[in-house]
Regions:
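Cellulosome-associated attachment modules in secreted, modular CAZymes
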Residues: 13, 17, 743-809
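A recurrent domain-boundary module in secreted/ectodomain proteins
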Residues: 730-747
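GGW-centered surface loops in extracellular recognition modules
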Residues: 21-49
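Consensus positions within tandem repeat domains that build extended binding/scaffold surfaces
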Residues: 77-80, 100-105, 123-128, 146-151, ...
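Small/polar residue-rich beta-strand/coil "junction" motifs that cap repeat-based extracellular fibers
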Residues: 707-711
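Sec-dependent, cleavable N-terminal signal peptides
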Residues: 1-24
Length: 809
């Protein structure tokens, strides 16, 4: 054991110097590491910053001697003086050729320092956070300036970059907030990302002729720049700027050649393409002349050149890039050459002084937002070759009066003409197949539109808010009218829906308050939610015989609607579908309907009667609530669920007629006042109805099963078949009626042929009677279904409706 301890102590003794010190020797308070015949200045401790080794004025010798050996001092090691905040000055010998990364990081007290002309590289973070440095001279020997080399040297007021520098790395001078002037020498080829970001005292930049690449946001937040000087226009036009804020012009706004500001720009003949961001923000430009050599104009090339008044694009140019002339608010005249094929996204957005536009026939695509928010634009000629009008192409061109979309156009993009307030007329070419989302929304002055037959889809909100539109004709190829397509077209009074429309989507015609009549063609299968809600002038609706679904609130608040016939194709009507149609007096329901949803007819206060067809099984909460004018209701035995408040506040119901056969399974019929009750032959049970009858007409030969909840009062008169009088007088609960009358004629409304049931044969018998006048064997009194004391063709219609509303065969 003692041997092992001794061995461990011996190893520790050998390693201990290495653990406590990273230097090889020290001379005159300077610490060194040996590398062959050379010495590198380093720090004292086992890690950088362990001790504040250096303070005051430091002088590094050319040579240093240790143990009789002389070494040439050739480099400053990594982290050598890191965070030595008390060091005020430093002299380096000409023998030093390399300065390591982080060498002077955080030396905030360092005010005077000269980089020897022997140094070839300034590495990453070398002088980072040396906030006391005021004057920096990068010697001609230096080739590269590393990443964050002078990051946040906030006291630096003067910077001289040597002519040997070819690359300035990212963040190299970021946050040098006192720097006012900058000259990039001509040997520099690349300025990397954010190299001069937040140099917010910088006013002047001179760009050398050798620069070809400027990285992303190289001059970001250099907000006090006023002047950029180029040595020559040709190399300037060839610089590849990564972003707008890579170009110092974005903030400076003024470009100089020598002492003269460039206002009338002539692009050199040697230039074939204007690069991205080349003149972005140069508001001092008033004109630009392109040579025929130029074939393309890059993205943001002249964006926000607010002084430009006139631009002529030569025929050699094929493509105008994204936002190329964005925000050129002074541009009043634009001539596009006949070689241009594509106008890029937002190319002329916010050119608010532009008044007229002629698109040459060479142009096939006007991309997204190309002329959006050109508020002064009043006249547009789109040429005859444009195939695509991109999204937002002419959005908020508030001065635009009239647009003719040529036959070449296939698609009109989303919001293409959104918010063109003064546009009164649009002619849509006969090749357009799709009208995009909000394409013409809020064109408040648009008077009308004719959708040609080639159009298949009208997308959501396409014409929403066009409140001066009085007419809309939808072509015969349109299959879908999108959600809110014509919402708030408050003047729309003349509407034609094409014969191929299959779906009318949510709120398609919502709040079209001038619309009086709608014909929904037989092609339509679905009328979606709120499609015609708040069409307050709508009096007449014809629903085609292919509609299967009417969505919720579809015709709600259509207060002028007087009657509706729901075709038998309809299987579903959503909640609130006809809510508050306060002028509706009659409605005919589909015999395919199974459910009347919650509040479907709530507030139809003029409705006089309702016949619920025999297909219905469920009547929902408030289905007919507040139908104050409702006097007569017909309920089939198919109903298995009748909501307690289905007829809430229907104070004037005086007649309840059951139809069908078998048991009443609907439960309580919640009507508070006394009513006349009619029960046909074939009903076998009326348990749980909970009705207060003023009079009951029960035509069943066998008294239907009854319970204590069938009737709440027995003071009214019970009319029964004379032949069944004794049976009712003896039947439980029926016998409780104070006055039971046996009618000599067994009156079953609709039983024309006297077989004690109502069927299609009764319709045939009634028609024959009306044609021949022969009533032999008929009970004609049973045919007066509308109680007008005469039998006419109107009773045939009533009899058919009775059959459709019941399970009777």
């Amino acid at each position: 054991m003692q041997t092992m301890i001794k061995t461990a102590l011996t190893v520790l003794a050998i390693l201990l110097p290495a653990l406590v010190s990273a230097h090889d020797f020290e001379v005159n308070g300077i610490y060194y590491n040996i590398n062959g015949n050379e010495a590198t200045v380093t720090y004292q401790g086992s890690y950088a910053g362990q001790y504040n080794e250096y303070s005051g004025a430091i002088v590094i010798p050319e040579t240093v001697t240790n143990d009789g050996i002389t070494y040439a001092v050739t480099s400053i090691g990594e982290h050598a003086f890191e965070n030595c905040s008390d060091m005020t000055s430093l002299e380096l010998p000409s023998s030093v050729t390399a300065i390591g990364s982080w060498a002077f990081y955080g030396c905030s007290g360092l005010k005077s320092f000269e980089i020897p002309n022997s140094v070839t590289t300034i590495n990453d973070y070398t002088f980072c956070r040396c906030s006391g440095l005021t004057d920096v001279v990068v010697p001609n020997s230096v080739k590269t300036i590393g990443m964050s080399a002078f990051y946040t040297c906030s006291g630096m007021t003067n910077l001289s970059i040597g002519t040997g520098v070819i690359s300035i790395d990212r963040y190299a001078f970021k946050g040098c907030s006192s720097l006012t002037n900058l000259t990039i020498p001509s040997n520099v080829h690349e300025i990397k990302e954010c190299a001069f970001e937040q140099c917010n005292s910088l006013t002047n930049v001179t760009m050398g002729s050798g620069v070809t690449i400027v990285g992303k946001d190289a001059f970001l937040d250099c907000t006090n720049l006023t002047k950029v000087t180029a040595i020559d226009l040709t190399p300037w036009c060839r610089i590849n700027f990564a972003t707008q804020k890579a170009n110092p012009l974005y903030y400076a706004h003024h470009l100089y050649l020598g002492a003269a500001e460039v206002t009338n720009l002539t692009i050199p003949a040697s230039i074939t393409s204007i690069g991205d961001y080349t003149f972005t923000g140069c508001s001092g430009l008033t004109s630009v002349s392109f040579p025929n050599s130029v074939t393309g104009i890059g993205s943001y090339a002249f964006s926000e050149c607010t002084g430009l008044t006139s631009v002529t694009i030569p025929s050699a140019v094929a493509t105008i890039g994204r936002s190329a002339f964005y925000g050129c608010t002074g541009l009043a005249s634009l001539s596009l050459g006949n070689g241009v094929t594509t106008i890029g996204s937002y190319a002329f957005q916010k050119c608010s002084s532009l008044t007229t536009l002629n698109i040459p026939n060479s142009v096939t695509a006007i991309q997204e937002g190309a002329f959006s928010r050109c508020e002064g634009l009043s006249s547009v000629n789109l040429g005859n070759s444009v195939v695509t009008l991109g999204n937002y192409a002419f959005e908020v061109c508030t001065g635009l009066k009239c647009v003719v979309i040529p036959n070449s156009v296939k698609t009109i993009g989303s919001c293409a003409f959104y918010g063109c307030d003064t546009m009164t007329d649009v002619i849509i070419g006969n090749s357009v197949t799709a009208i995009g989302y909000s394409a013409f929304a809020y064109c408040h002055s648009l008077k009308g539109v004719v959708i040609p037959d080639a159009v298949i889809t009208i997308d959501n909100s396409a014409f929403s808010g066009c409140n001066s539109m009085t007419s809309a004709k939808i072509g015969n190829s349109v299959t879908t009218i999108g959600s809110s397509a014509f919402e708030r077209c408050t003047s729309l009074s003349d509407l034609t829906i094409g014969q191929s429309v299959a779906s009318i989507r949510n709120s398609a015609f919502r709040n079209c308050e001038a619309l009086t009549s709608v014909v929904i063609p037989n092609s339509v299968t679905e009328i979606d939610n709120c499609a015609f809600i708040e069409c307050s002038a709508l009096t007449d609706v014809t629903i085609g015989n292919s509609v299967t679904n009417i969505g919720y609130s579809t015709f709600a608040e259509c207060s002028a609607l007087t009657s509706v016939a729901i075709p038998n194709s309809v299987t579903s009507i959503g909640m609130d579908a006809f809510k508050n149609c306060s002028g509706m007096t009659s409605i005919t329901l589909s015999n395919s309907l199974t459910t009347i949803e919650e509040s479907t007819f709530e507030g139809c206060s003029a409705l006089e009667s309702i016949v619920i067809p025999g297909s219905v099984t469920t009547v929902g909460y408030h289905a007919f609530a507040n139908c104050y004018g409702l006097a007569s209701i017909t309920l089939p035995t198919s109903i298995t669920s009748l909501a307690y408040y289905a007829f809430e506040s229907c104070y004037h119901i005086s007649s309840v007629t059951l139809t069908g056969e078998g048991e009443w399974r609907g439960g309580t019929i919640s009507i508070l006042r006394a009513v006349s009750v009619s029960i046909p032959n074939g009903i076998t049970s009326v348990k749980g109805m909970y009705l207060k009858p003023s009079v009951v007409y029960c035509y069943a030969m066998t008294p239907p099963a009854c319970d204590a909840n069938s009737f709440t009062d027995y003071s009214g008169t019970l009319h029964v078949p004379a032949a069944a009088l004794a049976a009712y007088q003896a039947a439980p609960y029926w016998q409780n009626f104070m006055n039971i009358v046996g009618d000599a004629v067994e009156a079953t409304p609709g039983d024309v042929n006297g077989d004690n049931k109502v069927s299609i044969s009764d319709v045939s018998a009634l028609i024959n009677y009306l044609l021949s006048g022969d009533d032999t064997g008929l009970k004609i009194a049973n045919a007066d279904l509308n109680s007008d004391s005469k039998v006419s063709i109107a009773d045939v219609s009533s009899l058919i409706n009775l059959l459709l509303s019941s399970d009777t065969e």
